[in-house]
């Protein structure tokens, strides 16, 4: 079995973040990174905006910092787990973001890395700690080539371990390290200086850090700017010119500011209020800090954040009464109320601050209301301080959530609970959905019988002015839009036809013409540009007697009519008059659909015609001898009748022909008007219902020029990087459900449309008004007959696959409604606006989800543990339909959150062969509480819940599972099969003891005959439940695995994950299955067969054959995240195959797709191999080009210059290599950033097997067209660029 792996939602625990001007000298960007990928955000305005795509790293990122060049541009310094140190800069081409390597050095990866390596950069050097014994310096010279010199290695002092490292940015080549002498147990503060002349790292001074109290230890250091600039005397003698850097050291109870020369030692205690409020077992730690130089260099702002969430401001100023010696104060600044432990603070020069938190849901963007006063009281905490206010809050999937709940598979929807505040009884629910949310602005019921709508906006109008409603009773209703109101409009007589005919088409033509096409006639009405209600009849046209108009299509100057006698009528607008061309071609079959290229500036050269013989013909509209040729230039045969057509211009003489078919399939063909060639680029079966309408909506998500703060001269600076938004065309497809086809980041997608009440839309048209922006707004008719005005503001794409809808639900006893917290529909890009006064401190809880369907109500039971030491948890019930809380009975009361007097470990739900639902809740004390539950119909509560009994087990229980009419309870190395008794759970049967099993942590069942158990040490075992009610262990794994999750894929196949970040598939072979079947699962016969076939091996190695059979390893893959759960979905969003979803502890959502056809496997394998070898291909090819260039220069000197060779070199280097080359040659790691060995990474703990890495395949999509062409030519000559892109997008569009 071959699987294709894709990460749909990347890890969200951002362990690294750095700020800098990465894309321009005066820009404000922030880089955030997990262990596996890098993201870039623009902070120019008050809302952060994501720039380009993610940079995926196929290794673990250990350290990240920035180094600034002489032009004020920031470069990234990265250190990977593979031992590679890389300096790179960002390059933005359109919407494609790349990291271009400038320097690469490989350290000895065999060095013991007991302590996490650290990287800090100064202006002209980079300092790295690698292993326990080494410090490495990389000299940097921005004015010379090569800029980065060979690293210089230095040994640490004996028995010394580097705990913290920082760069003194105001002093070139100066560093400070906080080190621990492991022998003497002494903390040391070392000032280091890299001497360029001596090429040596010098220890300029060292201090032992001591405290009078045992529990007051140094744990943090940070940079302080050059205090001499701010009038502080940093030396004893004014005459000395030697620089004296300062550094801040954080202890558990105070901070200490020391200088390099040892002259000053300034100590500031933390406020007593904080120290007294700390729990006995908690120490105060400084977890983050940042420094911002104020405008005009008038001062600096240095903020510290503690693990309690408090922000402190450090003030250092000269003592004018004592020779300007420094005075330091530690002042309370403010508190970030819902983030107590951030990993980084970032202060930007536009007066804002970003807090990055690794172990929390939220990353907060704040605004400075004030930077405080130096004369404030610094001894106490002032809870009324309001120096900062929250601008927005960005919510991620909880990095340590134990599970997600799969709500539905059409559209693909997950539910994730955010932190809850137990005092306010509120919860935050994140609905993560792979769909295009249609944001609803207005919804209004319409008269019964509306079958179609048309919106009208002429060239003279800025907004749409009329909506035409087509009724099934052969009438037409006109609605007028004015001043953001819609009302019925009755025009003057002898203009529009409103009765006794069915309107099939209404549109504008030319500057001021409106055409209305009915079954029995069409009319052209002229509109006065000065008076929107002054209509004038210009033309009436009637078909021949006994003939009706079946369909019509028009653009700015052309109108095509399809008649019931199979004739096509062509009319062209000239001088506000529609002129009919005499020739009317007659087709052999009934015309079902028409399409013209709708371009306001050009005439369409082609006409697409669908006919009842399952054909689509593309006819030429070229005028020959004053007649339309109607020559068939392209045709396509279909499997069913084409029901709707649409043509959209793609530029460069290319058009896309969209085809909706009666059998529910949807196709997109690319037509080249230069040679009239046609190629299919997308095909998807969307259901069984006919695709009745294809509607085009222009969506403009492009961000206009972003404004920066004024510079020092008062002039505002504009961000020139305008290419960060998106402008595209959305084709809305109406069938069984509503879908949308669109292009995003140069790739084509098709995703379902989502409406909150799951309404199906019949048709959709463009719409705009004075209060609704036209970019992405639309007017739709729902199947229930209501008019819906809404808009698009999020389109899923490879780099942002899910939208997020944050919903706040009130769980207090006096509230029963769900309150929406606003649509954060942009997934991970846009932020959610928040009211600071409503922010509460959120905790991280362990949750279990359980789907419960009873009496037509689909709900989710949510069990939540507190993170404190109290033995309690809570249960709440969420209605899947509207994400609202449901009431539960609790001691005769109706509550939304039921308290349970224990912590929950696992849950199970079953009827156990009765009519009554039983809920089994396993506590952490190995007690199972059995509840009887049912959905109430008496209106008092939504769910009635009654405790039946509780059963305690002696040995620790980690999981439970319902099997047949029994509850499986693992006890040490065997399984107990229990049934519900009157006073406790009763043992119905006991499974056999499994000798090699130590601790059963997970369970899964297949149908009524097989059980899989996962052991924390000894992998997976497969058990068989025989017809004689015996349980036999029939197979196990040959490897030891620390299993965290398992799931049956079929009767013989199990997928699982372990704590080392690997996913694997185990299977019982077909041959072994045949043996089991022949033995009828009889234990005696199986033993005889085992002795007969494998007796010799059993005698030699009895521990190997401790079961009848062994599970074969079918697939193995490293995902770099611990899997907490799997879901197997047969049909997801009209996919053509089942999908395996997995959820990771760091917030990952991924999938494994089975590849069913050999051609799929070979294509995707070739793409994977091309990208795996891309770095090698790039480097070797360009080394060859370097040699050619050298030969060329030598030949030029000898006047033997070959123009042909020059042409090849110029083409190869000038178009591709020229932007990436350096004077020292081409840098390795062009495509994988950290130059990782992909196979080694995906085989981190075990060799990868039968899994194609879709993540590395999709990095091809983020390359520029030049790089794509170059790589395809040299690494995969059998493929072409278009084929590769279509193959990758087919996976996204058809498989998921």
UniProtKB/Swiss-Prot annotation:
GO terms for molecular function: nucleic acid binding. Its main location: nucleus. The keyword Nucleus applies. Keywords: mRNA processing, mRNA splicing, Nucleus, Spliceosome. GO terms for cellular component: spliceosomal complex. Belongs to the RSE1 family. Involved in pre-mRNA splicing and cell cycle control. Associated with the spliceosome. This is Pre-mRNA-splicing factor RSE1. It comes from Candida glabrata (strain ATCC 2001 / BCRC 20586 / JCM 3761 / NBRC 0622 / NRRL Y-65 / CBS 138) (Yeast). The lineage of its organism: Eukaryota, Fungi, Dikarya, Ascomycota, Saccharomycotina. The gene is RSE1.
């Amino acid at each position: 079995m071959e699987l294709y792996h894709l990460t749909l939602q990347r890890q969200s625990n951002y362990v690294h973040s750095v700020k800098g001007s990465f894309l321009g000298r005066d820009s404000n960007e922030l880089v955030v990174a997990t262990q596996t990928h890098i993201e870039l955000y623009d902070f120019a305005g008050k809302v952060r905006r994501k720039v380009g795509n993610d940079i995926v790293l196929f290794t673990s990122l250990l350290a990240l910092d920035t180094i600034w060049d002489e032009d004020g541009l920031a470069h990234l310094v990265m250190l990977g787990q593979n031992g590679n140190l890389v300096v790179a800069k960002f390059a933005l081409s359109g919407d494609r973001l790349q990291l271009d390597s400038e320097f690469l050095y490989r350290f000895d990866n065999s060095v013991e890395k007991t302590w996490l390596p650290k990287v800090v950069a100064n202006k002209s050097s980079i300092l790295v700690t690698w292993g326990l014994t080494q410090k490495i310096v990389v000299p940097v010279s921005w004015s010379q080539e090569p800029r980065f010199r060979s690293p210089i290695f230095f040994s640490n002092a004996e028995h010394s371990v580097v705990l913290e490292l920082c760069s003194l940015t105001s002093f070139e080549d100066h560093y400070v390290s906080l080190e621990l002498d492991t022998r003497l147990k002494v903390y040391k503060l070392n000032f280091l200086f890299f001497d360029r002349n001596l090429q040596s790292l010098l220890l300029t001074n060292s201090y032992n850090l001591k405290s009078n109290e045992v529990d007051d230890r140094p744990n943090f250091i940070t940079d302080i700017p050059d205090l001499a600039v701010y009038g502080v005397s940093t030396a004893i003698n004014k005459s000395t010119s030697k620089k004296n850097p300062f550094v801040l050291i954080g202890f558990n109870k105070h901070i200490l500011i020391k200088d390099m020369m040892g002259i000053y030692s300034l100590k500031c205690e933390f406020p007593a209020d904080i120290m007294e409020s700390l729990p006995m077992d908690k120490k105060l730690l400084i977890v983050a800090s940042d420094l911002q130089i104020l405008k005009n260099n008038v001062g600096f702002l240095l903020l510290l954040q503690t693990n309690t969430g408090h922000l402190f401001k450090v003030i250092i100023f000269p003592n004018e009464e004592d020779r300007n010696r420094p005075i330091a104060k530690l002042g309370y600044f403010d508190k970030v109320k819902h983030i107590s432990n951030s990993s980084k603070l970032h202060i930007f020069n536009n007066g804002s601050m970003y807090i990055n938190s690794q172990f929390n849901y939220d990353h907060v963007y704040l605004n400075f209301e004030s930077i405080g006063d130096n004369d404030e009281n610094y001894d106490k905490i002032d809870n009324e301080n309001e120096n900062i206010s929250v601008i927005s809050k960005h919510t991620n999937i909880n990095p340590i959530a134990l599970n997600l709940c799969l709500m539905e598979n059409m559209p693909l929807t997950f539910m994730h609970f955010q932190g809850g505040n137990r005092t306010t009884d509120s919860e935050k629910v994140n609905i993560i959905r792979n769909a295009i949310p249609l944001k609803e602005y207005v919804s209004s019921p319409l008269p019964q019988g509306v079958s179609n709508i048309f919106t009208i906006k002429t060239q003279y109008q800025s907004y749409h002015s009329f909506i035409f409603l087509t009724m099934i009773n052969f009438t037409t209703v006109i609605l007028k839009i004015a001043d953001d109101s819609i009302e019925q409009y009755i025009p003057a007589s002898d203009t529009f036809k409103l009765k006794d005919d069915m309107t099939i088409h209404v549109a504008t033509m030319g500057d001021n013409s409106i055409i209305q096409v009915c079954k029995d006639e069409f009319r052209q009405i002229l509109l006065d540009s000065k008076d929107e209600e002054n209509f004038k009849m210009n033309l009436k046209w009637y078909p021949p007697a006994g003939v009706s108009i079946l369909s019509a299509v028009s653009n700015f100057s052309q109108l095509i009519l399809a008649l019931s006698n199979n004739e096509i009528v062509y009319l062209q607008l000239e001088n506000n008059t529609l002129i009919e061309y005499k020739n009317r071609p007659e087709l052999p079959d009934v015309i079902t659909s028409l399409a013209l290229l709708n371009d306001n500036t050009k005439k369409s050269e082609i006409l697409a015609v669908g006919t009842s013989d399952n054909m689509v013909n593309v006819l030429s509209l070229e005028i020959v001898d004053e007649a339309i040729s109607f020559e068939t230039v392209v045709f396509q045969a279909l499997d069913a009748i084409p029901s709707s057509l649409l043509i959209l211009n793609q530029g460069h003489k290319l058009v896309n022909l969209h085809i909706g078919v009666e059998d529910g399939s949807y196709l997109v063909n690319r037509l080249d008007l230069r040679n009239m060639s046609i190629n299919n680029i997308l095909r998807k079966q969307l259901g069984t219902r006919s695709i009745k309408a294809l509607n085009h909506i222009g969506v403009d998500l492009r961000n206009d020029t972003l404004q920066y703060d004024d510079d020092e001269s008062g002039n505002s600076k504009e961000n020139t990087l305008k290419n960060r938004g998106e402008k595209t065309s959305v084709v809305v497809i109406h069938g069984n459900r509503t879908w949308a086809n669109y292009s995003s980041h140069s790739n084509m997608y098709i995703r379902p449309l989502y409406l909150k009440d799951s309404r199906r839309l019949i048709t959709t048209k463009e719409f705009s008004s004075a209060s609704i922006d036209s970019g992405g707004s639309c007017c739709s008719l729902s199947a229930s007959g209501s008019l819906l005005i809404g808009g698009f503001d999020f389109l899923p794409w490879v780099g942002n696959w899910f939208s997020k809808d944050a919903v706040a639900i009130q769980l207090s006893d006096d509230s029963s409604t769900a309150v929406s917290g606003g649509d954060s529909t942009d997934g991970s890009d846009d932020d959610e606006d928040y009211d600071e006064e409503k922010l509460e401190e959120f905790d991280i809880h362990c949750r279990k989800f359980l789907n419960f369907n009873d009496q037509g109500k689909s709900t989710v039971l949510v069990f939540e543990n507190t993170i404190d030491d109290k033995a309690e948890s809570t249960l709440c019930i969420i209605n899947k339909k509207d994400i609202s809380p449901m009431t539960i009975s609790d001691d005769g009361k109706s509550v939304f959150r039921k308290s349970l007097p224990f912590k929950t470990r696992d849950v199970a739900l079953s009827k156990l062969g009765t009519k009554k639902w039983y809920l089994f809740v396993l506590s952490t004390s190995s007690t199972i509480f059995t509840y009887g539950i049912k959905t109430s119909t008496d209106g008092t509560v939504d769910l009635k819940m009654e405790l039946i009994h509780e059963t305690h087990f002696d040995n620790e229980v980690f999981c439970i599972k319902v099997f047949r009419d029994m509850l499986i309870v693992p006890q040490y190395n065997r399984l107990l099969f229990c049934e519900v008794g009157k006073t406790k759970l009763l043992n119905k049967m006991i499974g056999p003891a499994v000798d090699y099993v130590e601790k059963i942590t997970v369970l899964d069942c297949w149908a009524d005959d097989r059980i899989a158990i996962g052991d924390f040490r000894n992998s997976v075992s497969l058990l068989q439940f025989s017809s004689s009610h015996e349980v036999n262990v029939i197979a196990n794994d040959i490897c030891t695995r620390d299993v965290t999750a398992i799931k049956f894929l079929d009767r013989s196949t199990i997928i699982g994950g372990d704590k080392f970040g690997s996913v694997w598939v185990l299977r019982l072979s077909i041959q072994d299955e045949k043996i089991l079947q022949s033995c009828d699962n009889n234990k005696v016969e199986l033993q005889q067969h085992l002795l007969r076939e494998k007796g010799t091996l059993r005698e030699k190695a009895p521990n190997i054959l401790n079961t009848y059979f062994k599970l074969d390893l079918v697939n193995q893959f490293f995902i770099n995240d611990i899997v907490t759960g799997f879901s197997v979905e047969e049909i997801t969003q009209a996919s053509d195959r089942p999908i395996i979803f997995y959820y990771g502890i760091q917030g990952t959502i991924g999938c494994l797709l089975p590849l069913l056809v050999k051609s799929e496997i070979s294509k995707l394998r070739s793409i994977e191999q091309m990208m795996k070898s891309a770095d090698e291909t790039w480097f070797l090819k360009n080394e060859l080009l370097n040699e050619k260039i050298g030969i060329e220069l030598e030949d030029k000197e000898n006047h033997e210059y070959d123009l042909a060779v020059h042409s090849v070199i110029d083409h190869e280097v000038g178009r591709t290599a020229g932007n990436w080359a350096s004077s020292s040659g081409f840098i390795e790691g062009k495509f994988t950033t950290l130059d990782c060995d992909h196979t080694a990474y995906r085989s981190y703990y075990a060799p990868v097997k039968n899994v194609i890495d879709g993540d590395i395949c999709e990095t091809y999509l983020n390359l520029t067209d030049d790089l794509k062409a170059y790589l395809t030519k040299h690494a995969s000559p059998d493929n072409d660029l278009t084929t590769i892109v279509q193959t990758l997008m087919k996976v996204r569009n058809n498989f998921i």
